[in-house]
Amino acid sequence: MRMEDEDYNTSISYGDEYPDYLDSIVVLEDLSPLEARVTRIFLVVVYSIVCFLGILGNGLVIIIATFKMKKTVNMVWFLNLAVADFLFNVFLPIHITYAAMDYHWVFGTAMCKISNFLLIHNMFTSVFLLTIISSDRCISVLLPVWSQNHRSVRLAYMACMVIWVLAFFLSSPSLVFRDTANLHGKISCFNNFSLSTPGSSSWPTHSQMDPVGYSRHMVVTVTRFLCGFLVPVLIITACYLTIVCKLQRNRLAKTKKPFKIIVTIIITFFLCWCPYHTLNLLELHHTAMPGSVFSLGLPLATALAIANSCMNPILYVFMGQDFKKFKVALFSRLVNALSEDTGHSSYPSHRSFTKMSSMNERTSMNERETGML
């Protein structure tokens, strides 16, 4: 938290309080009162829009996938992705309230830990699911026969279980370090990496930054960057580049549409998360840059990052087969997209789910490669 030096003994030291902007911990002391107010209003508006669209879009996907669709491997991916994003959006109102109340936390220490844990857990779960979707599609293109024989719903559920457990462990620092404290008449929800009590003799001052707390801060930040962004982006990019090369070499791509979808998926994911992780890495060496860069940049980067939770239904469903045909009802479009098996992209969107399911099962290997996204 950026405080004036004379106030620092009664506040959270910068090296100890990790301003986790993903859950609305936005510190605006480097901004003018007007700028700070405008920024808070902006965040409340953006978070509210994301919350509404995310709950509506992901909720609709969950309902259709659970009650209307035949269980396929793709269905398992889409369902888990929607559940992860839905949980993220459900807890956004807490952080919308936090921002609206000028960052005064009224929900208690336990909820401070749990809410942040769920948000970070969603980040890892969503990223890992997007990665496994890309890997699954790549394998289906490179090894169609193996994929046909070994790709099963049971295996997909097992993979999702591993993803959720792995995300749990990577998010567990929030349950340990998350804390609340009364600072300047407000209750703050923050990361207390020194695990000391604010205001106590063990609480580090501005000139006496806790090296252990800073080390923990660095480990958490770098781990989130590597596991939650860099490695998944490299895998996703490699998968789709491999798919593009395979389709071009075999001359299976009849249109440019699959390539547009591939580019859109990669660029959108990169744009949503790159600013957030980059600024958090730079913040480890915050003295090298003006505080206003983080006060303005991190809220904007955070808004962009959380927007990914409501973009996924658009990118992975509405950009599917023939979704630009306005005459088709929304429900039919969702059913059509969610019933697609990996590699199918040539069915008219007005066909019924029953007919599509039977056709999916009879589709040849060549069609699977041709339509692979």
Curated annotation (Swiss-Prot):
Residues 65-75, 136-154, 246-261, 321-373 are cytoplasmic. Its main location: membrane. One of its GO terms (molecular function) is signaling receptor activity. Residues 341-373 are annotated as: Disordered. Prominently expressed in developing osseous and cartilaginous tissue. Also found in adult parathyroid glands. Expressed in cardiovascular system, brain, kidney, gastrointestinal tissues and myeloid tissues. Expressed in a broad array of tissues associated with hematopoietic and immune function including, spleen, thymus, appendix, lymph node, bone marrow and fetal liver. Among leukocyte populations abundant expression in monocyte-derived macrophage and immature dendritic cells (DCs). High expression in blood monocytes and low levels in polymorphonuclear cells and T-cells. Glycans are attached at residues 9, 192. Disulfide bonds join 112-189. Pfam families: 7tm_1. The chain crosses the membrane at residues 42-64, 76-97, 115-135, 155-176, 225-245, 262-282, 301-320. Coiled coil: none annotated. It comes from the Eukaryota. The modification Phosphoserine is found at residues 339, 349, 352, 358. Residues 1-41, 98-114, 177-224, 283-300 are extracellular. It is found in: Cell membrane. Residues 364-373 have a biased composition (Basic and acidic residues). Induction: Up-regulated by inflammatory cytokines TNF-alpha and IFN-gamma in monocytes. Up-regulated by TNF-alpha, IL-1-beta and IL-6 in endothelial cells. It is a multi-pass membrane protein. The keyword Phosphoprotein applies. Residues 344-363 have a biased composition (Polar residues). SUPFAM superfamilies: Family A G protein-coupled receptor-like (SSF81321). Keywords: Cell membrane, Disulfide bond, G-protein coupled receptor, Glycoprotein, Membrane, Phosphoprotein, Receptor, Transducer, Transmembrane, Transmembrane helix. GO terms for biological process: chemotaxis; complement receptor mediated signaling pathway; G protein-coupled receptor signaling pathway; immune response; inflammatory response; negative regulation of interleukin-12 production; negative regulation of NF-kappaB transcription factor activity; phospholipase C-activating G protein-coupled receptor signaling pathway. InterPro entries: CML1 (IPR002258), Formyl_rcpt-rel (IPR000826), GPCR_Rhodpsn (IPR000276), GPCR_Rhodpsn_7TM (IPR017452). Receptor for the chemoattractant adipokine chemerin/RARRES2 and for the omega-3 fatty acid derived molecule resolvin E1. Interaction with RARRES2 initiates activation of G proteins G(i)/G(o) and beta-arrestin pathways inducing cellular responses via second messenger pathways such as intracellular calcium mobilization, phosphorylation of MAP kinases MAPK1/MAPK3 (ERK1/2), TYRO3, MAPK14/P38MAPK and PI3K leading to multifunctional effects, like reduction of immune responses, enhancing of adipogenesis and angionesis. PANTHER family: CHEMERIN-LIKE RECEPTOR 1, CHEMOTACTIC RECEPTOR. This is Chemerin-like receptor 1. It comes from Homo sapiens. The gene is CMKLR1.
